[in-house]
Amino acid sequence: VINVSIGTNDEGNIYAYSSSIDSPVSRWGWIALLIVVTLLLVAVFAGKSGMKMLVPILLIVDLIIMVMVPAMYSGTNIMLLLGAIVWLSSITICVLKLGVRTKSFVAILVSLVMTFVFVILMYGFDNLAYLSGITYEITSFVESIIPRINTAGEIEIAMDVHALNIAIAAIMAFFAAIPVICKTIQIYDEKKDGENAIKDTIDEMKEYVSDKLVTIVPMLFTLIIPKYLLLIINKCSFAEIINSEVLGSDIVRILFIVISVVLAVPISANMGKLLIDDAHSARKE
């Protein structure tokens, strides 16, 4: 059951918005059962390493649901929340994958730097392409965001929608790139004594990145199917479709994620040379 509230604005025009959604059906039992089945399958077929990676996954989900989303709704700076999520997640994932070693520090540093650069570049590109970040899913719930009213009686926007879109894209890019970063650092650490350690590392990572993209790209592009159907249903022309704000924002998000995954290898290999080699040289001395 969707509860709809009806009101009038200052000009007397009637408007309606959904205020809450009630469901007479209890689904939690089935969802809990599916969670248990999923955990059992991970334990059986992914083994110890799979169970170990459930720790950061559960931590991250808890941070996003219990901390990030409520804080965003209350008006907390979205970029600060993004930084906190990426920082905590990178520490947890890198330490679990690489241990408490110099390699982990390198991987954490690379992930933080790449996320910062990602945000700056995406903001810049959006400004050049006149994209506001209003994606389909953001448009769907914007009506439910209650604006704040300050002491002067003026309405303030409760959330920066553009920043929200970039934060979502940055989180997706981070989780797509962090396995690539950790694996690149691990491989470079094994090859650092060779003459062409960086080149050898990049060459060995090419197949891994290709497999990663084959998995990620089709999955991401399926997300734009509802938006594309919406434009087709509204009989938009080809020019209107390719210039659509809703579709364009999603495509830009996907392409930036792909770029992050691809660039994670050379950036990680070069950062690994600067830091791992220094630690290696210090041990020799």
Regions found by a protein language model. Name each.
Residues 110-114, 148, 153-171, 207, ...:
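Pore-lining and gate-forming transmembrane alpha-helices of multi-pass membrane transport proteins
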Residues 1-29:
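Extended, hydrophilic extramembrane loops/domains of integral membrane proteins
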Residues 221-285:
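Hydrophobic alpha-helical transmembrane segments of membrane transport and translocation systems
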